[in-house]
Structure formats: structure tokens, C-alpha cells
Amino acid sequence: MKSAEGATKKSGLLIAMGLGILGAVAVAAAPKMIRRGRRLDFDNKVVMITGGSRGLGLEIARKLLREGATVALLARDKAELRRAEEILEAFQSRVFTFECDVTDQAQVNETVARVELEVGKISVLVNNAGLIQAGPMETQTLSDYKRTMDTHFWGPLYATLAVVPGMKERNCGRIVNISSIAGLVSVPHLLPYCASKHALVGLSEGLRSELFKDNVFVTTVCPGLMRTGSHINAEFKGQNKKEFALFSMMDSLPVTSIDSAQAAGEIVEACRYGDDKLVITMQARAAEAFHALSSGFVSDMFGLVNIFLPGPGKDPKIDAVKGSQSKSSFSPSFMTKLADDASVRNNELGSN
């Protein structure tokens, strides 16, 4: 009798263990199955990309065009847009360009209406327009903070508010917000940039929760340094030549940055599956992890780094100077070659 009871208990235990293992496997597999179920085919989809005439925006456009998408590129500079059309000539029947300042809500609303009328219903919005201004805190003005907030926070919000009603009506959509690792971990000499990118991360994560019920998936992208060639058009204050040299070298070296085409590919994949968040580069993921463990320690370490960065100088330049006007013996040089080459490929040199 005892033997039979023991066998019954043993078999019950084995069944429970088996069910537990099956349950664990199901729980582990569920996210992947759900992700696969959200897969979006970009063929014949209309994608609107702000800041699409150069840099990362242009790289994302290339990737999407190869997958059959039709792209609407938005930028402020008509000449840049024209050059972008020439660069993408092989896909010209699926490339449309629109002049638009994303900091002007009326312009954004008008442009979205034009895109939907002239090109088609917008399935994907990529909020990519951005600016970078580097320099010590002492050289940054309130206008600098306002300008970056207008571009990195209000611009994406205006575009999102303009496209969301249509996406809700069709019960389908994707919104990709290009923030930065600086939107998760603040770094010295980029205060206005960091503050505005933090604001975009908060907006983007909240939008995902709000729009989930409408089958509109919002992806927050936080890249580390990328070789887009944007250092040429970045702005520098204080000792601008030293700031530019450091920035362009960090932006170029393979140990600190990633190829922009690779980054664009990762962004397109995250958009395809409606992922919640994408942090690009191993260095950026490490910074995020360390910051999560001890934000104070990371901030203090950056404080030590800041001691060795260029100061404001005896006569700080309050007016920002473009990278293309801040050249020195260090930049351009062999140490910045990869980023300099990217600036040619990604239409960053046109206005310089």
C-alpha cells in the first residue's frame, strides 16, 4: 500500500514538474510569438521621416526603400532635399520630399495633410529631425535649451498628433522616435541636447502605453555614437575647435561609434516588429546598465571627465560655430576619416 502511495506521489510530482517546465517554456516563448505576430511588411507602405534629407534619416530611407516602402522626406532646406532626391534616384518613383520646419505646428499639420493627399496614408512615422550643440554649461543660453526642446520634443509631438488620428482609424501604425543614449544618461557639454532627449524618451514611452490599445506601436530608439557624418553640421561653443576635434574623433573611431547603415538596419527591424525600445551600440547599453545600477556613481564619473574637457575659454564664444567652420590639425585627420567619409555619403556636406 505504501509502495503504491509512493508511486502515486512520485508520478504526481513528475507531472507537476513537467507542467511547470511546459509553462516556463510557454512564458519564455510568448514574447517572441507576440513579436512575430506584430511583424509589419513595409512593401507599399508610406513612411514619413522628419530630418530625412541627410544623416541617419537618409540612411533609414535607403533601408526602407529597398524593402518596397514609399518615403516622404521632410526637412527645412530645399537644396538638401533636392540632393537627397538625386542620391535616391534609383528609387525616384517612391521618393517624395517636403519642405517643413517641425518646430512649427501649422507647417507640420499642413505637410502631413499634403503627404496623405499626394502620397498616401501614413503607416509609419519616424521622428528623426534633430540638432547637436556642444559646449560647456557656461556657454549655453536659455535660447539653446528652447531651440533643442522645440526640435526634439515639440517637433515629434506635433508630428505624432498629426498622424495618430489616421493610424487609430485604420487600427494600425508605427511611430519611431529617435532619441539618444543621452536621453537616458546625461553627459557633459551637451546639456540642452540631453535635457531635450530625456523629454523625448518620457514622451515616447508614455505614447506607447496610450496607443497600444489602438494597435499603434511606438518605438523609442536611443543610439550611442554613430558615423552619420553629422559632426560637420553639429554646432560648437566655447573653444569650438577643441570641442569639434574631440567630438569628431569620438564620432569616427570604431571603438566608440557604429556605422550609420548598421544602425539604420537595427532601427528598421525594431520598427518592423513594434519593439518598445532599442539601445544601439554596446557602449550605450553598458552606459545604460551602469546608470541603472548607480546613477550617482555614473554622474560623478562624468563629472571627473568634465574636468579634462575644454573650458569655456577666456572669451567664450556665445554664438555657435558649425563643425565645418571649426577645423584644426586634429580634425579632419586620419582619426576622423570614417565619419568624414560618412558625411559625403549621407548628404551632410551640401551647405558647407
Task: Tell me the role of every PLM-derived stretch.
Residues 136-137, 141-146:
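Substrate-binding pocket helix/loop in short-chain dehydrogenase/reductase
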Residues 180:
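Residue(s) in the substrate-gating loop at a strand-loop-helix junction
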Residues 46, 53-54:
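Conserved glycine-rich cofactor-binding loop
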Residues 213-284, 289-293, 299-309:
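SDR active-site lid
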Residues 67-83:
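Conserved glycine-rich Rossmann-like NAD(P)H-binding loop of the short-chain dehydrogenase/reductase
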Residues 78-80, 99-110, 142:
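The beta1-alpha1 cofactor-binding region of Rossmann-like NAD(H)/NADP(H)-dependent oxidoreductases
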Residues 160, 196-199:
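Active-site helix of classical SDR
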